[in-house]
Amino acid sequence: MKQSHFFAHLSRLKLINRWPLMRNVRTENVSEHSLQVAMVAHALAAIKNRKFGGNVNAERIALLAMYHDASEVLTGDLPTPVKYFNSQIAKEYKAIEKIAQQKLVDMVPEELQDIFAPLIDEHAYSDEEKSLVKQADALCAYLKCLEELAAGNNEFLLAKTRLEATLEARRSQEMDYFMEVFVPSFHLSLDEISQDSPL
């Protein structure tokens, strides 16, 4: 059997730090970010289904979110101000992402490619799936800002403001629910969030 470097590459996502141009109280890597986005995306899909009459596959949404930044193992995490400096750069970066996604799919053994390609290639996502993953991605970036600000790092003030505008643009009923029910706890200390459930 032919060897595949697919998972060896993906394991290196933990070596790619996010927010590279900003001072961080705690560094966040792409691997841990992807896990958090998967958990939040799954929650958004579940909320949409249970509370607002949605009919999406929450488990698939979690998988899509888990792989949503996989191509960054080949491209790196380009800082947002660079990525969206102008429309031409944004377009070219999208093209580079597409090539990187295909390169990752090509690493997968041929008999498994039909399983992994729809998870890695964002063009295989439905509009609804893409929307939920993007909502979760923005929410997790926003939560990172809250954590940094709570630790006294004002470097994230402008990023928080920018992300609030992004969240408003992507606003949905499931996001409103998540923001109301889960986000306030991110402003609290460990002692405060542990009071109601001591071991």
Curated annotation (Swiss-Prot):
**Can you supply one Gene Ontology CC term for this chain's record?**
cytoplasm
Organismal lineage: Bacteria, Pseudomonadati, Pseudomonadota, Gammaproteobacteria, Enterobacterales
Question: Which cofactor is essential here?
Answer: a divalent metal cation
Site (Appears to be important in orienting the phosphate for catalysis) location in chain: R18
Q: What is its EC number?
A: 3.1.3.89
The protein's name: 5'-deoxynucleotidase YfbR
EC class name:
hydrolase
Organism of derivation: Escherichia coli O127:H6 (strain E2348/69 / EPEC)
An example of a Pfam family matching this protein is YfbR-like
Q: Where in the cell is it found?
A: Cytoplasm
